[in-house]
Amino acid sequence: MSFMDQIPGGGNYPKLPVECLPNFPIQPSLTFRGRNDSHKLKNFISEIMLNMSMISWPNDASRIVYCRRHLLNPAAQWANDFVQEQGILEITFDTFIQGLYQHFYKPPDINKIFNAITQLSEAKLGIERLNQRFRKIWDRMPPDFMTEKAAIMTYTRLLTKETYNIVRMHKPETLKDAMEEAYQTTALTERFFPGFELDADGDTIIGATTHLQEEYDSDYDSEDNLTQNGYVHTVRTRRSYNKPMSNHRNRRNNNPSREECIKNRLCFYCKKEGHRLNECRARKASSNRS
């Protein structure tokens, strides 16, 4: 199998002279697909340019090949077609990057982003899933669109009343701090399954189901007319999940409640004092085993 046949992404790629193919390092984690990840394109190009600045390149063709090896379909197929049309030995790297940007970059739709955010709530998802999905959607927001204070307000509207009050008490200064405080002050049972309790072995007893929001990767209705001002007045979602069944014979309710853990400064995971959840050795050991 030739070197060019090993390039991922499919499609035929023009042959290059051997001197155009130095032993440059490939980073599997640095990729751009060109499908539902337009918001990642600027960072992708920046990281590619940073990596390339540390390597001596014989010509533009080798730089194009390096960038191309970090593309997945459909971006990879576009690169193949674009280079075929321009000619691999004639096209410049700047022209290639400019073409990639113009073809795949789409300005973020603020209304769609806010519409997706308003579908989230701690009551429906638990704090773990809420944080995961909020981060994924928030990454699509333009970097300077909101102040940190506005970002914190947007996030805390999704929390339950109890969690909201605790986060507010800590007075977080950044969105990251607010999300961490919400995670730390919510009991383990509430993170994945809101309202559920733990049995004697610490396993979650699934006594109810929740309706989860579909991933934001799918396209939204073009008739969506949610405005930013309308979103500001959106009322936070209240708990709407089904209450778990209470007739489990083997259930033990001797675990400290969330309020007791907070009051007595106990770890939410092992129920012992002297450390917070992110410092819990038992939790880290459990994560390593899984």
UniProtKB/Swiss-Prot annotation:
The record marks G207, A208, H233, T234 as: Cleavage. It is found in: Cytoplasm. GO terms for biological process: retrotransposition; viral translational frameshifting. The keyword Acetylation applies. Its main location: cytoplasm. Keywords: Acetylation, Cytoplasm, Metal-binding, Transposable element, Zinc, Zinc-finger. Transmembrane segments: none annotated. InterPro entries: Ty3_capsid (IPR045358), Znf_CCHC (IPR001878), Znf_CCHC_sf (IPR036875). PROSITE patterns: ZF_CCHC (PS50158). Changing H275Q: Reduces level of VLP formation and maturation. Disulfide bonds: none annotated. It comes from the Eukaryota. A zinc finger (CCHC-type) spans 265-282. One of its GO terms (molecular function) is zinc ion binding. The modification N-acetylserine is found at S2. The keyword 4Fe-4S does not apply. GO terms for cellular component: cytoplasm; retrotransposon nucleocapsid. Capsid protein (CA) is the structural component of the virus-like particle (VLP), forming the shell that encapsulates the retrotransposons dimeric RNA genome. Nucleocapsid protein p9 (NC) forms the nucleocore that coats the retro-elements dimeric RNA. Binds these RNAs through its zinc fingers. Promotes primer tRNA(i)-Met annealing to the multipartite primer-binding site (PBS), dimerization of Ty3 RNA and initiation of reverse transcription. The N-terminal domain of NC, but not its zinc finger, is required for nucleoprotein complex formation and its chaperone activities. Retrotransposons are mobile genetic entities that are able to replicate via an RNA intermediate and a reverse transcription step. In contrast to retroviruses, retrotransposons are non-infectious, lack an envelope and remain intracellular. Ty3 retrotransposons belong to the gypsy-like elements (metaviridae). This is Transposon Ty3-G Gag polyprotein. It comes from Saccharomyces cerevisiae (strain ATCC 204508 / S288c). The lineage of its organism: Eukaryota, Fungi, Dikarya, Ascomycota, Saccharomycotina. The gene is TY3A-G.
